[in-house]
């Protein structure tokens, strides 16, 4: 268990540890953002959608090949003195695993971990300065926190946040308050924020993921603005 307390202006942490939450509930935010996430490549590898729509036959086969071979349950067997791979089954996990081998898939932040952070801090008003794929937003709605403030410069995810908020609030007896600005943390109007109980985020991977590359307002992304 991890607990934290604020002493003066310094945060002290007791019982340092790791919040080891499962990825079981990733789908509650991924439902709204998966197509955008699968179109976000990195500096070294293209995203699945990029490979599928723009890649060569060889690029696409790099992904389809493992599916064809049934990557999840292949076994090494000896045939005529030679070791070969045989067997394999085509199950749902095969598809994602295969594309992970041939492309780059932007990672999610586990919503249940965000929920745990808000719970540990007894937060009612939370700040997320990099809303990303809506994972911490999902964690907020599952928590006892009441107000969520955040920002993200990506116009595509910004539009999805509105869908996400509307859908979640329809499931609650009392809608929660959410305010998100379409900008980076460096341009967030901090003077408009109330007293925040918990400021918690997952900053962009500057040297890894290229968010909204080639899209509208690409120039507002951190990897573009602060590229060295």
Where do the PLM segments sit?
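Structured loop/turn residues at beta-strand edges in well-structured enzyme cores
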Residues: 7, 143, 194
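Conserved SAM-binding loop and adjacent beta-strand
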Residues: 99-112
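Non-catalytic substrate-recognition/targeting regions of SAM-dependent transferases
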Residues: 16-94
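Conserved S-adenosyl-L-methionine
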Residues: 113-190, 198
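Mobile active-site "lid"/loop adjacent to the S-adenosyl-L-methionine
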Residues: 196-228
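Intrinsically disordered, low-complexity coil segments
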Residues: 75-90, 169-175, 217-224
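Short, small-residue-biased leader/transition segments that mark boundaries at the very start
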Residues: 2-13
